[in-house]
Structures are given as structure tokens and as C-alpha cells.
Amino acid sequence: MSADENRSETHGRIKALDGLRAIALLLVLFYHCNFTFLPLHGGFLGVDLFFVISGFVITRGIWQRLEDKTFRIADFYQARIVRLYPGLFITLLATSIFAWLIMLPRELASYAQSLYSTTGLFSNFYFWRHSSYFSPSVDYLPLIHTWSLGVEEQFYLFFPVVLTFIFLARKYTTQILWVFLTASLGVFLLLASNYPVITFYLLPFRTWEIFVGVLLSRYIYRNHTTTSQNSSVADAVAGISLLGILAITIDYQQIAINSTYLQLVTVALFASLLIFLQHAKYLQAILANNLIQKIGALSYVAYLVHQPILVFLRLANNGKISNWQRFLALLLTFAMAEIIWRGVEKPFRNWARIAGSDWRVTSVFAGGSALILLLGFTITNSNFAFHKYTVAEKKILSFTDPSYVISYEYGKCFLGGAFAAGNVYNNCFSQSPAGTGTFLFGDSHAAMVAVPLKESQNNFSFLAHSGCFALLPSRLTVPVCDSFFAYELNRIEEQKPERILLGGNWLEGSLGTSYGEKILSKSLAATIKKIHQIAPASKIYVIGQTPEWSPNLPSVMVREKVPLQDGQRVSVENFAALSGIDARLETVAGQNDATYINILNSLCESSKCLAVVAKDGVNQPLVFDSNHLTQAGEFKVATIIQAAIS
């Protein structure tokens, strides 16, 4: 997300663009604040709008200078440093100080890695590699939002050169730009369903959005006229386009779940808005409002500072923040943006204008980057740690080691990534006679109880895939999971086991919305009916939710001073949502001749759930991250399941 380095207002369209920046920013802010009275489930689409705006503005600036024969690539990169670096430097500096004061050492170590990647402007690669299935909640990552900055800066590395060559072939400008856009869009559509993380974070799959802005820039300025004879029509079309975008972001999950095509619709509506906005008299006047203009002018810095503010607010309150605290974070975001703009960005630009030379600006950039890197190293050095662990706290936090996934048989019968049906998974299935044995299917929440169940069950079979629910294809599922479950259904039809267990993180599957719950309920009902059809004698069990804590249970225990003693309980913030999805799915299971195994009823008293359990005399937290069971937790939950199916 960035703004035009040339803030000339010789055209009213610049004011309109600031108004559009304000809209895009507010969508993102409200999405991350997650106000209970206004849940903008599609607010993240504001970043898509920023990509379009960036392509639009950057192309305009470069093309004008190419026509004037005044364009120098060195000048372009210097302008990028002057525009982007001061706000980023101050944000990283302040964020690092607060991280040192508030975060636990293990959290600091993760933060430092993201700090290094953000300083190098490749944080999108870092978060792509580390936003895996077992990564901490993004709500507790102060720099997660800088991925978009990484995408844009990587685009800026090659785009001036590309546009210069395109300028030399001006006769074919539009055709060449369409080739870039179509290639990126095609790859995005091809991979988005099966590889949503990589297509979210990496430039090749975002280039099409930026090139929409590039093409719009060339189209609008080539066809621009000063006439306003069609202003009424333009206002109507632009207004409808804007309302369409707002409707999508407000009711995103009501309209389409896991739909990459909704991105296309949003970008198309935004393109329509940009095209007609140049003649839309009344909408331009609205967007020229002083408050909207101010928000747009501060959009870059406000975007930078909002996520750290929200993260530290959550950490300081153990994840529990109210609507008024969210509103306070919103006000603080704009206050900090104004301070940074007046106290840092504006003076730095004035200095850069006076300094003139490339090497001075570059030297400041290099020196500041080195300072940030040194700061990151220093705050994560145990000798300088603000928080000192006790021996007991070190013991608790040792359970956050993701190596626990080894006990889930990851890579063997618990899969991730692409799925290819075949005999390669035969070892995951017992060779018991038809009509006997137990099958377990689902996502990681099925996998995490597989090992202890295998020890207690004769003729036990298990196959799971991360992020794949044991459900028939629906708007909640993706193609790789549909193929996976089709394979599972074939095995059920072949062997017709005595018992079939379906496990999943159902709350995540419903996306936390009432509409998602409706889709999930219908899908589960259809799945149970399908299994009854192909294996009429099989008994079907649906494994319920397990407790979850954010960002992870060991950190919550350390912050709340909970000792590692068997039987300790810790409050679950989203217990109402967990128990709500349990109640709904238990009804669905009962109505379709299946048994629902309610884990929460056995582990929780009201909203306080069992947080410490023992295995072989050793106490362990129930889960090692937010919701995946430790070895002791596996056996505890497996005991509940075993009692229900015996």
C-alpha cells in the first residue's frame, strides 16, 4: 500500500484518489478491529483496492516523465525511499520497543524474524513460509500486514524497467499490458483453490490487480475529457459500483465462501468506479470532503501502525478486547499517523528535496535499515530481555514446540498439500474383514487423536488431511479436499467398517458466521446420509470441538500465572462460539442417526476448560498452540472418544 510520490493537485482526480484510499483504508481497519456491531468479513478486500490504486498512480507518474524525457530509474527508487521509508522506520522502531516490553521471549524471537524480513521488504515471503497450519494466530503478529508492502516493493523493482520498454513500443502498449494482466490472472485462478496461501502472499498472483490499475491509468488519461454532460450517468454508475464494493465487504461470507471470484468482482467494480469517477460530479464532491481527504492522506502511515496497536492491545488484555477498546485503537491509529506525518514524513521529504543527491537518501535508508536490524538482534538477545523466565515458565513454554505434530503421523497418514489417490495410502488402512474395524477421517483435529485411538482399537484405520473436513463438496470445501474425501468415501464403500469417526475443527469450518454454520450443518447432514447410503450398517460418530486459546495455551498460562499442575483450568474466550457450533452439529447428527461426541462437556465447566493434563506422571498443557493437542492432551481426549464408541 503506498501513495503517489507526486501530490500535485492539478487534476481533481488526485483528490478523488485520496478519497478512494480513505475507503480502502477504512475497510481494512474495520476488518482488523472486528467490531461486533459491524463485522466487515470482506474488509481485507481493501488491500486489493490499494493494489489497483498503486498501479494507477505509479503508471501515471512514470509515463508522464517518459513522455517528457525526464524519467530516471534512480530518481524513481529515491522517490520510493522518500515516500515509504520514514513511516516504516518509525513504525518498526516503535513496534520493536513495545514488543520488547510486552512480548514473551519466544514471541520476540518470532517477531524478530518478521522484523528482518520487513526491513528487507520481503515479509510476504516470510509470512507465506510461516503462516502454516500450526502457526500462531495472525491476530498476534504485529507485522503481518506488511506483506502487502513487500508485494508492492517487489513490483516496483521491475516495473519501471518493463514500462520503459513498453513505452518504446507505444503502438502496442495496451496489448502488452493485457498480456501481463491475463497471465497473472490465469495463474491466480488456476492455483487459488488448492494453494490459497501462496496466491495470497506472493507477487505473481497479485500482479493482475496492479495491472488493472496500470491499464486504467493509460485508458483514463488517454480518453479523458473535461465535459460533464454525462455527470448524472457517471454518478449513478460510480455510486452503484461503490455500493457494490461495500455490500460485498459487509456481507462477504453471506455471498460466497472461499470464492476467489469475489476478488474479481470487487476489482471489476473498483475499475468501473475509477472509470466513471472522472465525470461523477457529486461523488467527486463527497470524496473531496476534508475529513475523507485527511484520512486518505494519512492512509499509508495509518495502515502501518494499526496492526501493532491492535496486537499489543490484545496481548495486554490476554486476547480479550471490547468494542470501546477497539474504537480506542482506531483513534490511536489516526493520532499516531498524524504525529508521524507531521513529525517525521514531512520533515524527511523537505530534507530529501534539499539534499537532492541519490547517495545521501540511499545512505540514510541503509543506515536506518542497519539500525532496525541491530535493534531486532538486541531485543531478542536473552541478556537484554525485559521478561525473564522462571524455571517453571520455561517448562510450560517448552510445549509450544511444533515437533508435537510428529505424533500425528504427519506425512504418513496425516497429509498436507496436494493429494493423489492410489495404493500409496494402503498402510493407513487395516486389512480387517468387511464390516469390522474403525475408520477415522477429517483434518488435523482428527489426526491429533489417531495415535491413542489406534492403541486402544482393533483394526483401526486413519487418514486425514490438514484443513480438509470430512464433508461432501460444498461452498466450504476446496478441490483438493473434495478429491481427498471422495477417496475416503470409496474406502468406506469397499470395507464398510463397523464404526466411522468424523473429526474436524468445525468452528473454523463455519468461518465463525451464522451463514457458515448453516452451510456446515447442511453439508454434515448430507455427508452422514451419503455414508448411510454406501455403508448402511456402519455406526457414525462426529467428534466435537476441543477448547482453544489464543495465541496459544502455554503463553496464556505464563501470562496468567497458571501453574503446570494436573487439573488446572483456564478461561476460554470464545467458549460461546465453540459450544454454539457443538449444539448445532449435535442436533444435526441426532437427526441423521449419528452420534455426536461432545468433548467440551467432558473438559469444561462453564467457560473454564481443563488446561493441564498428565500422561505417565508428567503434566502437560492440553494443547501446544491454540487448539492442537499435546501428547497428554491426545490421550485425554481419546479416552473420552473411546468411552463414547465402546
Which residue ranges define each predicted feature?
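Extracellular/periplasmic envelope-modification machinery, especially enzymes
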Residues: S2-A3, Q229, Q254, A316-F327, ...
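Membrane-interface helix/loop caps of multi-pass membrane proteins
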Residues: S2-G356, G368-L374
